């Protein structure tokens, strides 16, 4: 029996041209089905981060259309962001905040109520539970990357984008992730 998976991301004729006229994405079409795991591979400047940023609604598009779970990323921005978790390339953390407070804050940004059990389990899986009351500034680079992953998963999204997720993460944890 042939099982058809539902499309969760649809990118149609996507064009992204930056102000300096650099063409980052040219008439890109892409369909991603629910449950699929994909990797974007290519050299620096190939448009991988630009594609992720446009799907997440963080970068404007020049033309084309992007839908996430049937919602337009421009018209239904909040709806699509609730569905997506994003771990960006750059570490963007509050250096003087405790790990748990930073993760909890990210969850609240999506209108989710506190769920200490869920957040504790998340921190356990990412080997951060014993660091949850530590100030982020005191963590290693790999631990900071894992805090970013915890923040991205804090609101329990259906879709997770990892832009360079294993940068500065030690080899053993990379295997587990």
State the predicted function of each range.
Residues 43-47:
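Walker A (P-loop) phosphate-binding loop of ABC-type ATPase nucleotide-binding domains
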Residues 160-163:
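Catalytic Walker B motif of ABC-type/P-loop ATPase nucleotide-binding domains
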Residues 104, 108-131:
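Conserved ABC ATPase "signature" region
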Residues 156:
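Conserved catalytic motifs of ABC-family nucleotide-binding domains
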Residues 135-139:
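Conserved ABC ATPase signature
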Residues 64-72, 79-80:
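Conserved ABC transporter NBD signature motif
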């Amino acid at each position: 029996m042939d099982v058809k998976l539902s499309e969760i991301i649809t990118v149609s004729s996507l064009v992204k041209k930056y102000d300096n006229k650099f063409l980052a994405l040219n008439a890109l079409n892409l369909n991603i089905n629910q449950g699929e795991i994909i990797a974007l591979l290519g050299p620096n400047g190939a448009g991988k981060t630009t594609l992720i940023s446009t799907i997440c609604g963080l970068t404007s598009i020049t033309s084309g259309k992007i839908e996430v779970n049937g919602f337009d990323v421009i018209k239904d921005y909040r709806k699509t962001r609730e569905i997506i978790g994003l771990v960006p390339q750059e570490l963007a953390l509050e250096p003087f905040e405790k790990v748990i407070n930073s993760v909890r804050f990210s969850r609240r940004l999506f209108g989710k109520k506190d769920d200490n059990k869920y957040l504790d389990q998340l921190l356990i899986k990412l080997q951060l539970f014993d660091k949850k009351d530590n100030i982020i500034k005191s963590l290693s680079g790999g631990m900071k990357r894992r805090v970013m992953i915890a923040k991205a998963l804090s609101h329990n999204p259906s879709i997770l984008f990892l832009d360079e997720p294993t940068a500065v993460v030690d080899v053993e944890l990379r295997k587990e992730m």
